[in-house]
Amino acid sequence: MTDLAGGALEARIEYAARRKKEMNCCQAVLVAFADKLGKSEDELLRLGSGFGSGMGTMEGTCGALVGAIMVSSLLSPDGEARNNSRAIMSRFKELCGGATICRDLKGIGTGKVLCSCEDCVRNAVLAAGEAL
């Protein structure tokens, strides 16, 4: 568990950004909400392990965004997960230059980085926190 029980959103954002240095983007977002999810860090690390680097290929959805939607799905009241997912996706796109695919965010093919991994993690935690 994290030491963020009852912590402010800004503390979660900074915690996730620090933890990103040790794990993939999805995992960093998940562990920032471990206290709210009631899951151990080990469980969340395993859950998020396959979602780094755009699901392993940089071709898929950003792992940080996937992690934020996982958090929302687990914490949203019945019937609200879909709306919260839309809100998270919309806010993430707004904060990350309109992209949600890892390779686009990283500027693969264009040479223009829209959002660093650390900023994707920060933005995903922010979007999830705002939606919830």
Question: Which residues make up each language-model segment?
Answer:
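Polybasic, low-complexity association/targeting segments
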Residues: 1-20
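C-terminal binding/interaction regions
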Residues: 3-5, 86-132
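Buried hydrophobic packing segments
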Residues: 29-33, 65-75, 124-128
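Acidic-glycine-rich active-site phosphate/pyrophosphate-binding loop
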Residues: 2-5, 30-49, 95-102
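Catalytic phosphate/nucleotide-handling subdomain of diverse soluble enzymes
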Residues: 63-64, 68, 76, 80, ...
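Short alpha-helical scaffolding segments that buttress acidic/His motifs in well-ordered protein cores
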Residues: 16, 29, 33, 47-52, ...
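Glycine/serine-rich anion-binding loops at beta->alpha junctions
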Residues: 51-71
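Phosphate-handling active-site elements
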Residues: 37-47, 73-87
